[in-house]
């Protein structure tokens, strides 16, 4: 059984037992989070949402939080001496999928 969920402006294909990194959520480690934007569920028969599957939820437990590797943003304009270097580290929340309710 697997499902496609939407969170943080992105879509993730998940199965029970999977560990995924999603955009930062305002939760603590050990908490339980429920994703109710389930776009697709396949448990032997496919259920496609319009836009979401009615009554379907995905329950996950929060493993931890962190920050991704640094991405360097470098701006440069020739002949003017203009250059600018900036770094960015995106925060994420790591969750473990416990149950898919469809």
Curated annotation (Swiss-Prot):
Protein's name according to its UniProt entry: Large ribosomal subunit protein bL21
HAMAP family linked: Ribosomal_bL21
Database matches in PROSITE patterns: RIBOSOMAL_L21
UniProt keyword annotations, A-Z: Ribonucleoprotein, Ribosomal protein, RNA-binding, rRNA-binding
Cellular component aspect of the GO annotation: cytoplasm; ribonucleoprotein complex; ribosome
Organism, scientific name: Lachnospira eligens (strain ATCC 27750 / DSM 3376 / VPI C15-48 / C15-B4) (Eubacterium eligens)
Assembly, per entry: Part of the 50S ribosomal subunit. Contacts protein L20.
One Gene Ontology biological process: translation
Gene Ontology molecular function, alphabetical: rRNA binding; structural constituent of ribosome
Family: Belongs to the bacterial ribosomal protein bL21 family.
Entry keyword annotation includes Transferase: no
Its job: This protein binds to 23S rRNA in the presence of protein L20.
Family annotation (InterPro entries): bL21-like, bL21-like_sf, Ribosomal_bL21, Ribosomal_bL21_CS
């Amino acid at each position: 059984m697997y499902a496609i969920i939407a969170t943080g402006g992105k879509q993730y294909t998940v199965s029970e037992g999977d560990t995924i990194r999603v955009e930062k959520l305002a939760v603590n480690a050990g908490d339980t989070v429920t994703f109710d934007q389930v776009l697709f569920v396949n448990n032997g028969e496919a259920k496609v949402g319009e836009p979401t599957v009615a009554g379907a939820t995905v329950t996950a437990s929060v493993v931890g939080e962190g920050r991704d590797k640094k991405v360097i943003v470098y701006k440069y304009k020739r002949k003017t001496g203009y250059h600018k270097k900036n770094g960015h580290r995106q925060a994420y929340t790591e969750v473990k999928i416990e149950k898919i309710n469809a």
